[in-house]
């Protein structure tokens, strides 16, 4: 079955950094437009590469069992409500690709999926998958003890980042995932995050969570993963910095330490 399907699940790391570099907050129209263009290019490239491999080595054994074999692409089956977020305008020639896929097939039965990418983001010094960072500085556990990681480009992009617990609602994040799902051929498991400090009496209303559930369904989410709640705790480290140490000084210290970081030398 593995050889017959040759399933792949390729996704993003560092989306928050990408949006920050382009000066786009998650809840902005600019972010939705950027993600639409990025993900169209991403999925088109994956399908093109798999199609070319099929021309050379033949399609996967179970290609005939996929929707692709009938010329059906993700852009044919997405929830059309996503068009409320971004106009369905495309840069690439999907009809030509569709014809090539019907004629030659694909080497892989699936291609795109979104993973948490917790480990790979550490090695790459990238933000986790498609998630907004919880803060500029995070402390992650490793075999050698706590690992300090700052968001990429902190010194010049810090004001551009969307921080998870600063978001007033999940709307922007929900929309970003919905736009991605339009092109992905496997379900994306998104997360919902709530900061009680943004609500009266520090209590998240059930109506807000219900609305998020209905909105994700409306825009074509297939599954959800975590419901995160801000508990006012911060990352803990064995030797916390002294009260006089501000984040800028800590960042400078970390950047110096990275010169001898084994992960950065990979």
Annotated model-derived regions:
Residues 1-266:
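Long, C-terminal-biased catalytic regions of enzyme "large/alpha" subunits
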